[in-house]
């Protein structure tokens, strides 16, 4: 276990649980956990934080993928095709992540956070509206493999936060899936991106395993709670919490970066 204060450890456990909670409902749990790791380990090499984040995320994402697969019809062949490309893309992204410094990583994460915040604010119906459906053509599948697979997979391995949300958006727009189908497919693809990146981080020895195991337990618990709360209160409640949390994280990261 890294040498950290009890307060920092508690903060990370809460962030891991909250990340699992949000991931289970709307995706984007990495938007909480990775910034929290950056705040908890401001002088640590970012590659170790990225690798630890992946080790935690794959546990909650796998559980969510199983849940979605049981409750929603999923085109497994399509998900596997996109997932295979995503695995390759994420492994490549993780390879380049070793050279990223915290001075570069913080502004990038802030940009991602602001982009997601703008989308959530401008699209308050996200998660409740019903996108148009249509036939999945070979061309659309190819675009999905390129964008959701290689492109977002590379981003997930390189940085990570927001990948689940980006996957849902891309799959909905490109394949014209409804939101439930897109979420189900995204979870399967996200497991592949997490696995590809985690293997690369593990090979490079940039995973804090003892910390990851502890945080994974809280992430899994948060995901279980999130699934049940989503059924009771709806995704609008979680989106509100996400907006408040993202604003707070952007403010703190900006303070650490420039003040």
Regions found by a protein language model. Give the residues of each.
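Transmembrane helix exit motif
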Residues: 63-73, 94, 110-136, 248-259
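Alpha-helical transmembrane segments in multi-pass membrane proteins
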Residues: 11-15, 19, 23, 34, ...
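Residues within membrane-spanning alpha-helices of integral membrane proteins
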Residues: 9, 54, 110-113, 117, ...
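Selective hydrophobic functional segments
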Residues: 51-104, 108, 194-244
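Helix-coil boundary and interhelical linker segments in multi-pass alpha-helical membrane proteins
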Residues: 1-9, 39-48, 95-104, 202-210, ...
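Selected transmembrane alpha-helices and immediately adjacent juxtamembrane segments
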Residues: 1-45, 131-183
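Small-residue-rich segments of transmembrane alpha-helices in multi-pass membrane proteins
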Residues: 39-43, 85-91, 116, 139-154, ...
């Amino acid at each position: 276990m890294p040498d950290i204060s009890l307060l920092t450890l508690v903060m990370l456990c809460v962030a891991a649980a909250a990340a699992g909670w949000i991931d289970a409902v709307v995706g984007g749990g990495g938007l909480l956990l990775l910034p929290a790791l950056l705040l908890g380990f401001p002088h640590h090499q970012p590659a170790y934080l990225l690798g630890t984040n992946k080790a935690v995320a794959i546990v909650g994402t796998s559980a969510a993928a199983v849940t979605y697969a049981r409750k929603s019809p999923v085109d497994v062949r399509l998900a596997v095709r996109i997932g295979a490309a995503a695995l390759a893309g994420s492994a490549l992204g993780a390879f380049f992540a070793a050279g990223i410094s915290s001075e570069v990583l913080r502004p990038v994460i802030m940009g991602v956070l602001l982009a997601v915040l703008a989308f959530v604010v401008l699209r308050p119906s996200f998660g409740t509206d019903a996108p148009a459906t249509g036939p999945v053509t070979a061309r659309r599948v190819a675009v999905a493999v390129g964008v959701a697979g290689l492109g977002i997979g590379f981003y997930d391995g390189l940085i990570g936060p927001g990948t689940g949300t980006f996957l849902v958006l891309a799959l909905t727009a490109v394949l014209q899936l409804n939101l439930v189908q897109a979420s189900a497919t995204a979870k399967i693809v996200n497991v592949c991106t997490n696995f590809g990146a985690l293997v690369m981080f593990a090979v490079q020895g940039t995973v804090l395993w003892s910390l990851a195991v502890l945080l994974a337990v809280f992430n899994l618990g948060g995901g279980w709670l999130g699934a049940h709360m989503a059924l009771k209160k709806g995704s609008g409640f979680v989106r509100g919490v996400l907006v408040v949390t993202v604003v707070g994280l952007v403010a703190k990261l900006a303070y650490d970066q420039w003040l």
